């Protein structure tokens, strides 16, 4: 069973942990290339192609990174333009942000960009209109709906496997692929990326993804900054210190373990030819 390997291409100072204003970004050291280098080395070593969701901001500042990803045969998706949560934007602001990222990525790659992931999984019940906007912009795939809730994001009763969302009574021509979770009865446990991947032991991650793979393809995700152990260590509240910095040194090893143990490919390759249900989210 093949799984999707995804990377959200943002720098350490873009994260919602810090929530720095855009006007301050130029004050911080660009380090996105360090994590990308490590990720590409792993993918090359195991001959795996992945899907990179790239911020428009990063693409404009580091066009050479986008070109390198394309030259190596990886798939490019949009992560929005300025790492704004959908929940902080109205419909027109969101459309403008996504369109800007799509334009720069298509210019750099020479390819149609038809895959999207929101920042911090911020397509939630009150921002379902964002899926209609993505369809208007000719996106065909999305990975923004998290099938569990956190203070910032999530959809309590969302499907845990790929589906076509029904919004306002209409099935969208947009395939949604949620991040993988391990079912626990009616509940579920995230394990496949971010802090969850850094906190959980390899044995549990292996067990959880094998359980998903009994019936479905899974999806894992990471960020370049999660492999960058030399990034600046800011004085932040304890909960932010934990969510952002905890166990960064384990990320590369766990990703390599997954690449050794499971099969991976790009988003579009994994979902190609599948039959997926249409589901109305409530």
Describe the role of every protein-language-model region.
Residues 1-72:
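Active-site beta->alpha N-cap acidic-glycine motif
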Residues 23-30, 53-55, 82-94, 118-122, ...:
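The substrate-binding groove and active-site-proximal loops of carbohydrate-active enzymes
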Residues 46-127, 139, 144-151, 172, ...:
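Metal-dependent polysaccharide deacetylase catalytic core of the NodB/CE4 family, i.e.
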Residues 111-112, 118-216:
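Active-site-adjacent pocket scaffolds in enzyme catalytic domains
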């Amino acid at each position: 069973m093949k799984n999707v390997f995804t990377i959200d291409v943002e720098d350490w100072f873009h994260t919602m942990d810090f929530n720095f204003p855009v006007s301050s970004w130029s004050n911080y050291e660009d380090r996105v290339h360090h994590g990308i280098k490590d990720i590409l080395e792993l993918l090359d070593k195991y001959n795996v192609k992945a899907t990179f969701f790239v911020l428009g901001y990063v693409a404009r500042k580091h066009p050479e990174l986008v070109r390198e990803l394309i030259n190596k045969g990886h798939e490019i998706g949009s992560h929005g333009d300025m790492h704004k949560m959908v929940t902080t934007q109205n419909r027109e602001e969101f459309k403008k942000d996504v369109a800007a990222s799509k334009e720069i990525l298509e210019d750099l790659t020479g390819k149609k960009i038809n895959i999207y992931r929101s920042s911090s999984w911020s397509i939630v019940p009150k921002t379902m209109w964002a899926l209609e906007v993505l369809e208007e912009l000719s996106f065909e795939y999305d990975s923004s709906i998290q099938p569990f809730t956190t203070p910032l994001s999530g959809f309590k009763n969302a499907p845990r496997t790929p589906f076509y969302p029904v919004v306002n009574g209409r099935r969208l021509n947009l395939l949604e692929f949620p991040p993988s979770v391990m079912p626990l009865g009616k509940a579920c446990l995230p394990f496949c990326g971010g802090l969850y991947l850094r906190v959980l032991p390899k044995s549990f991650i292996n067990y959880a993804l094998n359980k998903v793979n009994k019936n479905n393809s899974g999806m894992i995700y990471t960020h370049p900054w999660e492999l960058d152990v030399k990034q600046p260590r800011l004085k932040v509240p304890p909960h932010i210190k934990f969510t952002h910095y905890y166990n960064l040194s384990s990320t590369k090893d766990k990703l390599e373990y997954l690449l050794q143990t499971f099969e991976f490919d790009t988003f579009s390759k994994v979902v190609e030819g599948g039959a997926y249900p249409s589901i109305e989210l409530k």
